[in-house]
């Protein structure tokens, strides 16, 4: 789930829990990525049922197979907890969002490592129109146009990062 926050008062309230990073209030769109907690992935949940129905094209036999494969994955192959896996899934979305923004000239700044408890409490108290039940904060991204030219990034040499196996 994505919360796109342009309300300046809410951004001001969230800023202290993000170590007062100026991007929080300077950006035009502060996007919070919410991950799903374990209850969404319990066998028979309406979320899973709807998801599996979409994947199976509303074919009941195919839906049963998809359900069995996913439940086996949850039981046997999933190394972190379901909640941690859900957070990792949000990183895929965030990478795509940031790449898409860059491709059209919009800057972005990922925000993590903040005080998650304080941040989440502030979100819940400041946004009445969303039911936060069953969600956790995964990550946040500031989107907008930079005011000043960015300093040159220091990158590792490609050979220090990539090993080719032929």
Where are these regions (language model features)?
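Acidic, surface-exposed loops and disordered segments
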Residues: 1-166
């Amino acid at each position: 789930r994505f919360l796109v926050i342009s309300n300046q008062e809410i951004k001001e309230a969230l800023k202290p829990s993000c170590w007062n990073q100026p991007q929080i209030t300077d950006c035009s769109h502060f996007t919070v990525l919410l991950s799903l907690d374990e209850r969404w992935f319990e066998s028979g949940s309406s979320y899973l049922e709807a998801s599996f129905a979409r994947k199976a094209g509303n074919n009941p036999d195919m839906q049963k197979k998809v359900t069995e494969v996913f439940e086996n994955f949850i039981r046997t192959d999933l190394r972190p907890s379901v909640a941690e896996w859900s957070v990792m899934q949000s990183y895929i979305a965030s990478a795509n969002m940031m790449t898409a923004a860059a491709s059209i000239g919009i800057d972005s700044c990922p925000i993590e490592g903040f005080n998650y408890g304080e941040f989440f409490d502030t979100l819940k108290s400041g946004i009445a129109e969303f039911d936060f039940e069953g969600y956790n904060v995964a990550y946040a991204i500031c989107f907008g146009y930079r005011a000043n030219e960015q300093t040159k990034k220091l990158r590792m040499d490609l050979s220090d990062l990539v090993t080719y196996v032929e």
